[in-house]
Every structure is written in structure tokens, then in C-alpha cells.
Amino acid sequence: MKRVLTALAATLPFAANAADAISGAVERQPTNWQAIIMFLIFVVFTLGITYWASKRVRSRSDYYTAGGNITGFQNGLAIAGDYMSAASFLGISALVFTSGYDGLIYSLGFLVGWPIILFLIAERLRNLGRYTFADVASYRLKQGPIRILSACGSLVVVALYLIAQMVGAGKLIELLFGLNYHIAVVLVGVLMMMYVLFGGMLATTWVQIIKAVLLLFGASFMAFMVMKHVGFSFNNLFSEAMAVHPKGVDIMKPGGLVKDPISALSLGLGLMFGTAGLPHILMRFFTVSDAREARKSVFYATGFMGYFYILTFIIGFGAIMLVGANPEYKDAAGHLIGGNNMAAVHLANAVGGNLFLGFISAVAFATILAVVAGLTLAGASAVSHDLYANVFKKGATEREELRVSKITVLILGVIAIILGVLFENQNIAFMVGLAFAIAASCNFPIILLSMYWSKLTTRGAMMGGWLGLITAVVLMILGPTIWVQILGHEKAIFPYEYPALFSISVAFLGIWFFSATDNSAEGARERELFRAQFIRSQTGFGVEQGRAH
């Protein structure tokens, strides 16, 4: 159970997300032709959208932010599509299938970061930034050092997330489609590069919107059929599930997932603040026209995601009833065919037959593509906009910047494919957990304090940001997941699986201490600039001109 939790805990939406940690033993399934045909339809349709988008991408603004022409509703759907993962869909329903009520608590953990984004970040981020969150962090601070730190934080998060996505994609497709792992990884990598290379943010947005609609439809249909089976009574749903589950009434008892309060708190903080520091999520707020639309984006996204995670709870209990109690879905040893992560897929077959099973399998693949496209664009923009155009070659033309961005997309895609193949048999669950810890410990403190704390200086942001990033990496390496399970040592030096509680504390303390003790003239000037930044963040004055910081 501990390994299941570790794998799933590392698959935060994180969104974001894709088969973030379909890890452990994978049994290749027979080739599923219905799923392959439906997925090919999705690919052809989205490539058509990419061609359409490529005709409309004429400038840097079009490429990075779809020209700021996405509506709040569309962006909310796209954010949900970027955040709701195959791990969310398969992993949480599998967690409910095995642990019951605890799965609901865990699924709600995916949402706790969104009120922070809604009330503290979305409006000011949109008013101050243009293409990346580094625009905001460096608004009144030194451009070079802050952009380098922000870009490094973004690239580390993107790289870890992308590797986990690619490995998860290969294993998931092997499970659902019966395709060879290497073919699956190459296919995801090539499609990802095509979406981003030719269609930029516009194509990525519509891939994410389509994926969100398909996933919400599929999950809604499954939940509807489950509730129909029990007469639309939650009481009947829980009673029937308790009657057939090996744990009986214990599946309705909370508290079995995390072994101690420190781990629970650290996991919660990582989920909450990590979400608010994910570069591919933050980038989406620059695709709308103003702060009002940015707020609407979060409102709609939170609604869609909250609805989705409630559905996964119903799907998990439905799987207990209709899959767990049906020997047709068990192997000779009495285990679920393909492993517990297949619970939702088997339920799709139980409630909708082979055709719907093919649909859900294709949606799971589409989910991965939507996430990796967003990640790739975020990584490319960090290199081309933050590093190339604002640090290494100031004054670069739009054409030069876009060329660097597209070269970066190709490099990221090739690296992702190679590492996806190399990590095939490795435990990659820790990578997404580490990505969230870094986002929470490096990106989030700098974004938050740059917008809200007038005494922040470049010195404080640099020292605190780097300390948070390094602490998260070191503690993760010394913890049980890497030190014991991967490196094979007998006992972990750092006893907790989740470093966020400690690394976030180090980051905030470092930023406070080194800013408070900064008596330089540069520090004083940066403090004075806060008032002008505050007015811009509240009013959005000047944002219409798309000022480049």
C-alpha cells in the first residue's frame, strides 16, 4: 500500500498530470483496435487544428499567448485540460478502488492550491506579466539574475515532469492499446513537437480544451451509469461497495494513507503551493485579455476540476461494485487484470462495452498529449524569452526569439523521447513529486513575495530561491523514495517522503533574511519601485500595450 501511495502521491496533477506515475508492473494488453481508431481520429482532428493555428501564428504574442484572445471560459477549460491527468483519472479512481474514502481526501488535495491562485495570484500575474512568470518576478528586480533563477526553476520542473509523463505515457499505452513501449514514447514525442512547433499556444490551448471536454464527458457517462445501477442513491452505492470490498466497512474510514502528521502536512503544502508555481499552468493566464478574464479562468477551471474529482470518487466506488466483484476482470491469482490502475478502464467496459472502452482508452492518451504540449511550450518560452531575449541577447528581434523557441521545442522533444526510453524500467514516481516540491519551494515564494512584499530585493529573492530549490532536491535524494527504494540503502537519512514543508520554509526564511539585511543602494531602489508595481498590479494600467519588462 505504501508503494501505491508513493507512486500516486507523486502523480500530482500535477497536473498536472498525465500518466504521471503509471509505475510498477505493467502487463501488456491485447491490441485494442477500437481505442487505436478513436485515438487516430483525435490525432487527425487535432493536427487539423494545428494546421489552422499555424496560419494564425504570426508574432511572438501569437506563439506564446495565442495573442491574448482566449476567453475566460475557454481558458478555464484549457487549464482544466492541462491539469486533469491520466494519473488523476486512473490513479485516484484506483486509490478509491483499493482504499475507499481516503481517495476522496486525496482527490480534494488536487484542488487546494486553486483558491490561492484565484485570490492571490491570477489578477496581479496577468496585470504585471506578458509571456512568463519571470516577467512578474523581475518587474522591479534585476532582470538577469531573477530571469536565470526563474528559468532554471521552470526548466527543472518541466524536465522532471516531462520525463515522468513520457515514461507514464509509454506504460499507459502499453496497458490500454497493446502497443510497444518505445513506439508509444516516440509517438507522444513527435505529436507533442508538432502541436507546439507549428501551432504554438493556440494549438496547445485547443488540444487541451478538446481533451477536457472528452474526459469530462467520459467520466460523466461512467458516473451516471454507476449511479443508475444503484438507483441514484449514494447510500446504496456505499452499502453495496462495503458489502463486496475485502476491507468491508473500513473503506469508509479516513486516515490510512499518510503515516504521520509531518508527512501529511508536507504533502499538503507541496500540493497546495506547488500548483501555484507550475510554469505551464501560470503561463495560461497570459492567454486572456485582462485580469477579469484571468479570474474567470480560475473560477471555471476550479469548477470543472472539482466536478471531475467528484466523478473519480463515484467511479472508484463503482469499480468496487461492478469490477472488483466480477471475476471476468480478475486473473488466475484473483488480481485485477493489468493492475489496480486499470480499475476505471475495466469499469468503462462494464458500463459501456468495447466501444466505450476504446473511447476511454483514447481519451487517456489524449490526456497525456495535452499535458506534454503545455509543458514543452513552457520550457521553450523559459529558454527563448527569459534567457535568450532578456539575458544573453538583449534586444533580439521577435523572429530570432521565435526561432530559438522552436529549436528549443525540438531539443526538448528529442531529449524527452531519449530519456523516456532510457527510464523505461526505472521508478519515476519521485520525479513529479520533486517537480512539485521545486515549484513550491522556488517558483511560488518568488512570485508571491515579488507581488506582495515591498521589502523584497534581488539579493533576497536569489538566495532564498536557490536555497529552496537546492533543499528540495537534496532532501528528496536523502529521503526514503530515492535513498532507500532506488539507491538501495538500508535507511533514509531524511525520514520523510515529502520535502515541501522543510524546503518551502527554507525558501521563505532565506528570502526574508537576505532581503531584510540588504542595505545596498540597489536594494533601496527596488523597494521604492514597489509602489509603481502595486498600482500596475491593481489597475492593469499599461497592460493593453503588452509592455515587455
Swiss-Prot record:
Q: Name one GO cellular component term.
A: plasma membrane
One Gene Ontology term of the biological-process aspect is:
plasma membrane acetate transport
Highest taxon, organism lineage: Bacteria
One GO MF term attached to the UniProt entry = acetate transmembrane transporter activity
Family matches, as Pfam families? SSF
The protein's location, in the record's own words, is: Cell inner membrane
* Bilayer-spanning residue ranges: 33-53, 77-97, 103-123, 148-168, 183-203, 206-226, 262-282, 303-323, 355-375, 404-424, 428-448, 464-484, 493-513
Q: Which CDD domains has this protein been placed in?
A: SLC5sbd_u4
Can you tell me which family this protein belongs to? Answer: Belongs to the sodium:solute symporter (SSF) (TC 2.A.21) family.
Functional summary from the UniProt entry: Transports acetate.
What is this protein identified as? Cation/acetate symporter ActP
